[in-house]
Regions:
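Conserved protein kinase catalytic/activation segment
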Residues: 318-321
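A conserved helix-loop-beta module that forms one wall/lid of the active-site cleft
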Residues: 121-187, 210-212
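ATP-binding N-terminal substructure of ATP-dependent carboxylate-amine bond-forming enzymes
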Residues: 1-131, 135, 140, 162, ...
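Active-site "cap" helix and flanking loop/linker of ATP-utilizing ligase/carboxylase catalytic domains
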Residues: 2, 289-310, 316, 326-393
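Conserved ATP-binding module of the ATP-grasp superfamily
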Residues: 152-153, 174-177, 194-239, 273-274, ...
C-alpha cells in the first residue's frame, strides 16, 4: 500500500522535531510548509529537509529577507508575521490541495485555529473550528471549562486597566491574570492583593507588547482574569519533591477523549515549569480523578480529532481544577519520553487518527507496565540566584561554565543527555524566566522519588561560574 501524505505546518512547539519527523516519515509522506522561516532553527530545518518529500517556505517573507539564515537556537519567534488569519488559511489550503494531502497537522500553538479552518474546508479531520478557537483563546476556554461539570472559577475578560480594576474588585485575590493568546505560561501573573496591582498590570501589559505573535492570532480580549486555583500536593503525594499540578497527554478521536500518560511535575519558578517526570507515581484513585477532569475539559471544548496537552491543578481533598488544555502535543521532551518509557509513538498515532479516525489502532486506557522513569529538567537563573551564585542586582550575565556535582544524584538516577551553555553565553536577566533556560537535562532512574530528589539536589547544588568582568547590574 502506498503511503498517504500529511501536510505539516512546521513551526515552534509541541512534539520536538528530533522525534516527530522520523516517527511520521516512517509511515507517511511528509510535505512541510514553513509559514515563518525565522521560527525554524538550523537543526529543525535539517530534519525537515531530511524527512520531507517537499518543503515549501512562505515566499512573501523572502521578499524582505533575501539573505535569511535559520538561527542556531530559538525559544520564541521574535519577528513579525503580518498575514491575516484568512490569508494563512488560504496558504494552508493551497499547499494541501497541490500535494493532495490526506491530513494536516502542526505542533505550534499559534496556528491551531487557522489550521482547523483549513482542515474543515478541505474536508479533512481536525480539531474542529469552534473547538480550536476555544482551545486557543483562554477566555473562551475558561467559559467552556466552567460549563463542563468540573470546579467553576470566577473569570472576566480584560483589555484595559479599567477592565482589570473591575475584575480584581469582582473576583478578589489571589487572582491570576493570563494572556489569552500565548503559550508556555508567558506573561501569566499572580496578584496576591490589590496593593500595587495597577502598576503590576501595566508592567505586564507593557512587557507583552514586546512579544510578537502572528497577525493571524485572534482573540476577544488580550487577558483573562481568574480566581487562582490553590494547590495542595500533600493531599495527593506521599513524598516531597512534586508540584501541585500534573499534565495529561492524550488524543481526541471523533470527539472521544483518550488519555495516554499523566506527567508529574516539580515545583515551578513562578509559572515557569522546571521538570516533567514520565509517568506519574500517583495512586489509581488519583489517576481516575485526574482522567475524568481531563475528559470533561477536552470533550467540553468540543474537540474532534487532535492531540491534547491538559494541565490540572491538584487541590485540597483531592479536588481538581482545570488550568488549561491545548489542542496539540506537549512541548519539551514529554512525547519522546512517552515513547522511551512505554514504546508508544504518539506522533505516529496522531497522524493515524487524522487519516483513519476510529479505525486507527489506539490504547484504550492509561499506558502501564513501565520499569523506569524519565525526567526533563531545566535550570534557570533563579536557581542560581537562590544559591547565591548570580548577584541579585545583575541584569546581564556572561557564563564561563556550569557544573553539577556527582553527589547530587540519588539511587540509580543518571543523566541520559545534557545541554550546557558554552563559554561566553550571555543571558539577559530582564527576559521572562522561561526564555532563559541555562541547562537542560534528561534523567533516568528506576525510582520516581529518587529522580525527583536528584532534581531537587541539582537545583540547589549546581554551580555556575560567571565571567565577572562581564556581569552587568
Amino acid at each position: 500500500m502506498s503511503k498517504k501524505t500529511v501536510l505539516v505546518i512546521a513551526d515552534l512547539g509541541g512534539c520536538p522535531p528530533h522525534m516527530f519527523y522520523e516517527s511520521v516519515a516512517a509511515s507517511y509522506h511528509i510535505v512541510s510548509y514553513i509559514p515563518r522561516p525565522f521560527a525554524i532553527t538550523k537543526g529543525h530545518a535539517e530534519l525537515i529537509e531530511k524527512y520531507s518529500i517537499a518543503v515549501i517556505k512562505d515566499r512573501d517573507y523572502f521578499e524582505t529577507h533575501p539573505s535569511f539564515e535559520h538561527p542556531d537556537s530559538i525559544y520564541w519567534a521574535h519577528d513579525d508575521y503580518p498575514k491575516s488569519e484568512e490569508e494563512v488559511v488560504e496558504d494552508f489550503i493551497r499547499v494541501a490541495s497541490f500535494f493532495k494531502a490526506d491530513a494536516i497537522t502542526t505542533n505550534n500553538e499559534l496556528f491551531i485555529a487557522p489550521m482547523a479552518k483549513a482542515a474543515e474546508r478541505l474536508g479533512l479531520r481536525g480539531a474542529g473550528v469552534k473547538a480550536a478557537e476555544m482551545a486557543r483563546d483562554k477566555s473562551q476556554m475558561r467559559a467552556a471549562f466552567n460549563a463542563s461539570g468540573v470546579k467553576a472559577v470566577k473569570t472576566q475578560p480584560v483589555t484595559t486597566l479599567s477592565d482589570f480594576q473591575k475584575a480584581i474588585e469582582s473576583i478578589g485575590t489571589p487572582l491570576i491574570l493570563k494572556p489569552t493568546y500565548l503559550a508556555s505560561s508567558i506573561g501569566v501573573t499572580l496578584f496576591h492583593d490589590k496593593a500595587g496591582s495597577d502598576d503590576l498590570f501595566l508592567q505586564v501589559q507593557s512587557y507583552l507588547e514586546t512579544i510578537p505573535v502572528p497577525d493571524a492570532v485572534t482573540y476577544e480580549a488580550p487577558f483573562v482574569a481568574e480566581t487562582y486555583l490553590e494547590g495542595a500536593y500533600e493531599d495527593w503525594y506521599e513524598d516531597e519533591g512534586y508540584a501541585d499540578y500534573v499534565s495529561v497527554e492524550g488524543l481526541v478521536v471523533e470527539g472521544e477523549y483518550l488519555p495516554f500518560v499523566i506527567h508529574d511535575k516539580t515545583p515551578q519558578i513562578g509559572f515557569t515549569e522546571t521538570a516533567h517526570i514520565t509517568p506519574t507515581i500517583l495512586d489509581n484513585e488519583a489517576k481516575q480523578i485526574i482522567i475524568e477532569a481531563a475528559r470533561k475539559a477536552n470533550e467540553g471544548l468540543g474537540l474532534e480529532h487532535c492531540a491534547t496537552h491538559t494541565e490540572i491543578k491538584l487541590m485540597k481533598n483531592r479536588e481538581t481544577g482545570l488550568i488549561e488544555s491545548a489542542a496539540r502535543f506537549a512541548g519539551w521532551n514529554m512525547i519522546p519520553n512517552i515513547k522511551k518509557v512505554f514504546g508508544v509513538d504518539m506522533a505516529k498515532l496522531l497522524i493515524d487518527v487524522l487519516v483513519d479516525g476510529k479505525k486507527a489502532v489506539l490504547p484504550k486506557q492509561l499506558l502501564s507496565g513501565h520499569t523506569f522513569y524519565v525526567a526533563d529538567c531545566h535550570l534557570y537563573p533563579q536557581h542560581f540566584k537562590e544559591s547565591g551564585l548570580i548577584p541579585p542586582e545583575a541584569t546581564h550575565i556572561t557564563i564561563d561554565h556550569v557544573s553539577i556535582p556527582e553527589e547530587t544524584f540519588v539511587g540509580d538516577t543518571a543523566i541520559v543527555s545534557q545541554s550546557f551553555p558554552t563559554k561566553g553565553t550571555i543571558v539577559d536577566l530582564a527576559l521572562f524566566e522561561a526564555f532563559n533556560g541555562i541547562v537542560s537535562l534528561e534523567l533516568k532512574g528506576s525510582s520516581s522519588q529518587d529522580v525527583a530528589a536528584s532534581i531537587r539536589n541539582i537545583q540547589k547544588q549546581a554551580t555556575i561560574q560567571l565571567m565577572d568582568e562581564l556581569v552587568k547590574g
